[in-house]
Amino acid sequence: METINRQIIDIKKLVNEFSDFARMPSPILKKIKIDDILNRAVSFYKLSNEDLTLNINKKNKSDIYINGDSEHLNRVFLNLLKNSIEAIDEKKQKDPNLKGKITLEIDTNNEYIEIKMLDNGIGFKDVTNITKPYFTTKKQGTGLGLPIVSKIINDHGGDINFFKNSDGAKIEITLPIYS
């Protein structure tokens, strides 16, 4: 009976994520401060992951605004942070002394903001298929999280790239600065 209940929960999760992916509304764009989005997502996970170091490093100390949908972008960073935490937890199973670390580095030029997210988890197994719907390397994964993230970033006129890193994973996001 427990197996059936777990499968029902998994199917509900898959249906909900598929619905989100298929019917994702267009973003409602307005001037937002990117720091607010990042701080909100980081704060959410800091509370429940006290043994994890979560840092935001800004090269430019002034406020940075983008034309974005705060709810959509919050979803992006919550999803990416969740994936990083899961990757760190998986690596901790092999190395219990590992001190988990996630760093968000923010830099700008005249036109774009660049957000680099680095973690010291297990890293990506396959970056070529990572944003294809239903591709997953997780036992409980639906393969829709990163395609949704990619779609949201693209809908904001941005770009997202995933890299294998010798020490974990690296994600680079660029978004146009509000003008």
Language-model regions, residue ranges each:
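Short alpha-helical Gxxx[C/S/T] motif in the catalytic ATP-binding
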Residues: 145, 149
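Conserved catalytic submotifs in the C-terminal HATPase_c
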Residues: 53-64
